[in-house]
Amino acid sequence: MPKYRSATTTHGRNMAGARALWRATGMTDDDFGKPIIAVVNSFTQFVPGHVHLRDLGKLVAEQIEASGGVAKEFNTIAVDDGIAMGHGGMLYSLPSRELIADSVEYMVNAHCADAMVCISNCDKITPGMLMASLRLNIPVIFVSGGPMEAGKTKLSDQIIKLDLVDAMIQGADPKVSDAQSDQVERSACPTCGSCSGMFTANSMNCLTEALGLSQPGNGSLLATHADREQLFLSAGTRIVELTKRYYEQDDASALPRNIANKAAFENAMTLDIAMGGSTNTVLHLLAAAQEAEIDFTMSDIDKLSRKVPQLCKVAPSTPKYHMEDVHRAGGVLGILGELDRAGLLNREVKNILGLTLPQSLEQYDIMLTKDDAVKSMFRAGPAGIRTTKAFSQNCRWDTLDDDRAEGCIRSLEHAYSQEGGLAVLYGNFAENGCIVKTAGVDDSILKFTGPAKVYESQDDAVEAILGGKVVAGDVVVIRYEGPKGGPGMQEMLYPTTFLKSMGLGKACALITDGRFSGGTSGLSIGHVSPEAASGGNIAIIEDGDLIEIDIPNRGIQLQLSDQEIAARREAQDARGDKAWTPKDRQREVSYALRAYATLATSADKGAVRDKSKLGG
């Protein structure tokens, strides 16, 4: 029988000092022997996805204590990628994932907590907490802050839906008036919550639900809706049940590695491909799999991408649907239901409720359920009122979107595309692969060949795009922006956005060893591996080189002979200590970022630390 980890600090005469300190936090004799459950919050006033979380940790803690546990809350950091975008702040975004994972490990292991409730929401916070959960392998439940309501405004006598990316595009488009740009800016992000499209934050919260580590509805139920409070209340109750199942009943099925096993990872990636999720999810799932010691690689993702159709299309891939619409159509379990009926899922997986996939679908798939309360929950909709408060409204759609022919979520027979929303490409400068969000690529440019315009930094590329130096037919190459080369693997949302602003969204390609925001669409290919700073052939591309992109056949090729590639690599090596580094780039890199770069691996490994350098 497993022993409560917390007993290390609460039992025995030699722990009198530790108990004295616990007493100073409010614990009493009756509490010693109860499970100590960490409430891992990520409240911050910097991030709209987290601005409403201050009181939610207390809400969970009260339920834990009412259910027989002891709750102890702490906070992690949280970076807002949108605010950090387009300047040196973006260098810190991906490295913050590792800091979050480490800080959770430090706090939980230092104080011998028995289990966790992770209150996450945005881009690097959910992945960081997920990595820590699988690293620690103690009972855990995720409950996120929830999606933002879509922005809405009236343009040309028509009400349209908006999000952050629309504000960025309008702000950079010289044809848009100051008044219209200001109107869109003020309307784009109306409430607390993670940005309203299928961007990285919402993608990861959906995948955490698919992995089985959060409750039904968690990935799609709006932050502002009163129904979301129940997810927090039940998380507090259920984590105590889960904890006791493991420690008191010796039931290892309660542990995250046994819930989020390889079959669950395959299901999560299948969901991601079907819903056209952010390319960043590939990075984070690969990293989480390594923490779980699961053999899940780019090769697995490639195989899935070739057989999974696209069943859901959401902003930024279409302006028609946002997360509030996904929820109305049944949320994560609505998509999983269609995938299950198509025979594309592993059915033996279980979630934190102890339900198998078929049992979950029977109860929570709107196409199957007989439960009126479940149907009511999925009718939870937006109020259209600006607010930073959680659970502040109780509006509902009159009907569910169960139209699987033309609705937000489609059946296999009516798929948006028989090709999924993500694809892995391979070629002579992406030997270990690269990623493209095919859901956001226009059919006219699925095959594309053009001359390279090469830039050693995102900043130089942005200047060239806005300065008219990039023209239709070009392939923009931005390198030395990978995990090691950046360092920090910046998101390239500004270059892709500005290509659209300049009318080049369907006329150019962009390739990088960096990554993209979940808000990116267009022919944007990232995660090129190996990255330039690790000796990847992306470093030897020169202006004017022809690059061929063939998404249907999963290929990407620099049109050079093997002999010319070898000669250029020799020339690069001949630069000595300057080899595989950017030329003439002026960038201040702090010691914290240098430490990150020293251990960083390329994107095909999830940009995790190179354990071989640590003796691991």
From Swiss-Prot:
Its EC number is 4.2.1.9. The modification N6-carboxylysine is found at residue 124. It catalyses: (2R)-2,3-dihydroxy-3-methylbutanoate = 3-methyl-2-oxobutanoate + H2O; (2R,3R)-2,3-dihydroxy-3-methylpentanoate = (S)-3-methyl-2-oxopentanoate + H2O. Pfam families: ILV_EDD_C, ILVD_EDD_N. One of its GO terms (cellular component) is cytosol. One of its GO terms (biological process) is L-valine biosynthetic process. Binds 1 [2Fe-2S] cluster per subunit. This cluster acts as a Lewis acid cofactor. Its cofactor is [2Fe-2S] cluster; Mg(2+). Mg(2+) binds at residues 81, 123-124, 491. The active site is at residue 517. Keywords: 2Fe-2S, Amino-acid biosynthesis, Branched-chain amino acid biosynthesis, Iron, Iron-sulfur, Lyase, Magnesium, Metal-binding. Functions in the biosynthesis of branched-chain amino acids. Catalyzes the dehydration of (2R,3R)-2,3-dihydroxy-3-methylpentanoate (2,3-dihydroxy-3-methylvalerate) into 2-oxo-3-methylpentanoate (2-oxo-3-methylvalerate) and of (2R)-2,3-dihydroxy-3-methylbutanoate (2,3-dihydroxyisovalerate) into 2-oxo-3-methylbutanoate (2-oxoisovalerate), the penultimate precursor to L-isoleucine and L-valine, respectively. Homodimer. This is Dihydroxy-acid dehydratase. The gene is ilvD.
